Amino acid sequence: MKLKSRYTSLISVVSIFFSSMVMAESDIVISVDEGVSIAQPIAVVPFKVNGGVSEDVGQVVADDLRNSGKFTPIQRAKLPSHPASVAEINSQQWTDIGVDVVVVGQITPANNGYNVAYQLVDTLSNPAVVLVQGSFNVPATQMRQAAHTVSDQIFEKLTQIRGAFRTKIAYVVQRGVSAYELRVADYDGFNAFTVVKSKEPLMSPEWSPNGSKLAYVTFENKRPQIVVHDLRSGQRSVVAALKGHNGAPAFSPDGSRLAFASNQDGELNIYIANINGGTPIKLTANVGNNTEPSWSPDGSIIYFTSDRAGSPQVYRMSSSGNDVIPIGTRGSYNAKASSDGKNLIMIAGDNVVKQDLTSGSTEVLSSTFLDESPSISPNGIMIIYSSTKGTSKVLQLVSADGRFKANLPGAEGQFKFPAWSPYLTK
């Protein structure tokens, strides 16, 4: 049986490999579809600015916290006052509107750039108490990165979960029938850069565990091959070029191997290749079509899609190809394990679904159309995926608890195959 066609489907490090790429416009911008109704209220006061700063740092912080699905930032029009430090906060003002935590900050010129200082304040105490604070110097061009740093620190303080707002996404943009670009951007679509352009299809980008490389499928030699692209040097190496189709690359957690699918023997099967060369090893044994491999966090398990029982379904096997058992429901595919190994994110019934690997229970997270290619943030809090909107493919964002949903509409073209980076900073 033929699977659906969709199946074929750091700060210093970041600055190093970005400097060698072609810059693109910020072509995707988050637009809220469904807000959060039961998340924790938080107030992010506009940062007091001394000197000309074009970026609204406070708004970026508020957007980050909202995008996680854990917090509901209070609308600016409803803020009772605009303090810039804990000394200016009247706790009663904030508790009267149901806000227990407030973010305040200041931006001042410093060392040919700016100093960004913030405080996260507990207003349940009177006088208010600082929960966490920070201050750092950044060049003007890194103001959004500074805002994401503030968001990461606040998020971790309030949730005990590491923030992932300084991570990146990779995705493919198709314009027309013969113009493809592989791009990398901030998780929220800003600061997009083109990694490679091609007149032939580009598909299925996948980050290496340390964020320094991307594996992806290219048809540049008139047949599908899997290459590993070093984002620092720009060098590319072919890892899989078996006869027929080669697709769906997935790095092992240690970055030394790549699982992928190939139909060199007629049907699609899962293979593992060493990224430094050598003969790929076949893991599945010509039982139906097998594709879309992904690894468990410890590297001991590979999840994949197979139609061996008559229709697509997610299976698991050991990384040596043994102990194959079905996991997902009939019609499930595109499975990815969360960073803690407790959940699988997959597509089922054309929507993004979360499955608890202990209980087997499932939860539908998305309500969009023809969803595919889900990818999870490294802290497991957010999921990016592709869906169909009218005649276009667009990127969508949903929190892992399903509370927050947003779309990242592209300026022009079809946006496909999103892949969330690992952490890129210490």
Swiss-Prot record:
Keywords: Cell cycle, Cell division, Periplasm, Signal. Residues 1-24 form the signal peptide. It holds the Pfam family TolB_N. Its main location: periplasm. One of its GO terms (cellular component) is periplasmic space. The Tol-Pal system is composed of five core proteins: the inner membrane proteins TolA, TolQ and TolR, the periplasmic protein TolB and the outer membrane protein Pal. They form a network linking the inner and outer membranes and the peptidoglycan layer. This is Tol-Pal system protein TolB. It comes from Haemophilus ducreyi (strain 35000HP / ATCC 700724).
